[in-house]
Amino acid sequence: MAAASSRSFSLCVLLLLLLLAPPISASFLFDGGKSKSAAAAAAVDMEWRPATATWYGDAEGDGSTGGACGYGSLVDVVPMKARVGSVSPVLFKDGEGCGACYKVKCLDHGICSRRAVTVIVTDECPGGLCAFGRTHFDLSGAAFSRMAVAGAGGHLRDRGQLSVVYRRTACKYGGKNIAFRVNEGSTNFWLSLLVEFEDGQGDIGSMQIKQANSVEWLDMKHVWGATWCLVRGPLVGPFSVRLTTLSAQKALTARDVIPRNWKPTATYTSRLNFEAAL
C-alpha cells in the first residue's frame, strides 16, 4: 500500500513537470492518446458475453492484497472481501475499469450453478490468458468456487480454467457512501485522491474538485487505477468533488467532502452515492 501511494505521488510530480513543458501533452501521456469522450461508452452493455476464468491464491481465499486499482486493505474486508477480481486489459481499461462490477457464471451444468457470482474489478492480469485482447477473469478462490453447485467447489477449482459468460451489473455496497482517500505524499500543490465504494456503474470517467470560496471546477487527471491527481496550488479546502461515470456519464457532486484541515492518508466519506442501478 505504501508502494502504491509512492507511485501515485511520483506520477503527480511527473505531471507537474509535464505541465511546465508545453511541447508535451500530459493528458496524452495518461490517457494513452485517447480523449475521454471517445473512451466513454454511450450505454452500459447488459448482454451476456463469452470469456474465460481462472482462480488464484488460497482455495477459499479472498484474492489479491491491494491490486493495481490501489484499494489496498479494502479488498480484505466486507463489502469487497472475497468478491475481488483481476481482469484482462480490455476490461481494466488502463485503470478506468476499476470499481466496475460483473456477474460471471460457468456453463457446465453438471458442476456449475445456475447463479452467477458478482465480482468487483480491483486488479489487472496483463499476461498469459489475459493477453492479446482476450476477455479473462482471474478470480479469488472463494469467488471461483461460488460458481459451483453445492459441495462441488473443490472439483470446479480442480479444472483450473473455465469457459464462462459475464455481464455488467450494478455495484451495491450495502448502505456505504462514496469515500475519498487522500493518498500519501499529497500537499497543497499535489493532491491525489482514490475513490471508494461507488454504487451503480462503479467506474469513473472524470473527476473535478472545487476549492473553498470558488466557482471554478478543476479537472483532475487519471493517474492509475482508481487514483486521480491535481497539480496546482496552493489549494485551499474544503474541497467539493464532482464525479462522472465512464460508462453512461452519470454525475454526482459531494460538496465540501474534504475539510480544510485534510491530512494525507485520511479517508473522508460523503453523504451520498450513485443510484445502485445501471
From Swiss-Prot:
<comment type="similarity">
    <text>Belongs to the expansin family. Expansin B subfamily.</text>
</comment>
<dbReference type="Pfam" id="PF01357">
    <property type="entry name" value="Expansin_C"/>
</dbReference>
<dbReference type="GO" id="GO:0009828">
    <property type="term" value="P:plant-type cell wall loosening"/>
</dbReference>
<feature type="domain" description="Expansin-like CBD">
    <location>
        <begin position="189"/>
        <end position="270"/>
    </location>
</feature>
<keyword id="KW-0472">Membrane</keyword>
<keyword id="KW-0961">Cell wall biogenesis/degradation</keyword>
<keyword id="KW-0964">Secreted</keyword>
<feature type="disulfide bond">
    <location>
        <begin position="69"/>
        <end position="98"/>
    </location>
</feature>
<keyword id="KW-1015">Disulfide bond</keyword>
<dbReference type="InterPro" id="IPR007112">
    <property type="entry name" value="Expansin/allergen_DPBB_dom"/>
</dbReference>
<feature type="disulfide bond">
    <location>
        <begin position="106"/>
        <end position="112"/>
    </location>
</feature>
<dbReference type="InterPro" id="IPR036749">
    <property type="entry name" value="Expansin_CBD_sf"/>
</dbReference>
<keyword id="KW-0732">Signal</keyword>
<feature type="domain" description="Expansin-like EG45">
    <location>
        <begin position="66"/>
        <end position="176"/>
    </location>
</feature>
<dbReference type="GO" id="GO:0016020">
    <property type="term" value="C:membrane"/>
</dbReference>
<dbReference type="Pfam" id="PF03330">
    <property type="entry name" value="DPBB_1"/>
</dbReference>
<dbReference type="GO" id="GO:0006949">
    <property type="term" value="P:syncytium formation"/>
</dbReference>
<dbReference type="InterPro" id="IPR007117">
    <property type="entry name" value="Expansin_CBD"/>
</dbReference>
<dbReference type="GO" id="GO:0019953">
    <property type="term" value="P:sexual reproduction"/>
</dbReference>
<dbReference type="InterPro" id="IPR007118">
    <property type="entry name" value="Expan_Lol_pI"/>
</dbReference>
<keyword id="KW-0134">Cell wall</keyword>
<dbReference type="GO" id="GO:0005576">
    <property type="term" value="C:extracellular region"/>
</dbReference>
<dbReference type="InterPro" id="IPR036908">
    <property type="entry name" value="RlpA-like_sf"/>
</dbReference>
<feature type="signal peptide">
    <location>
        <begin position="1"/>
        <end position="26"/>
    </location>
</feature>
<dbReference type="InterPro" id="IPR005795">
    <property type="entry name" value="LolPI"/>
</dbReference>
<protein>
    <recommendedName>
        <fullName>Expansin-B17</fullName>
    </recommendedName>
</protein>
<feature type="disulfide bond">
    <location>
        <begin position="101"/>
        <end position="171"/>
    </location>
</feature>
<comment type="function">
    <text>May cause loosening and extension of plant cell walls by disrupting non-covalent bonding between cellulose microfibrils and matrix glucans. No enzymatic activity has been found. May be required for rapid internodal elongation in deepwater rice during submergence.</text>
</comment>
<dbReference type="InterPro" id="IPR009009">
    <property type="entry name" value="RlpA-like_DPBB"/>
</dbReference>
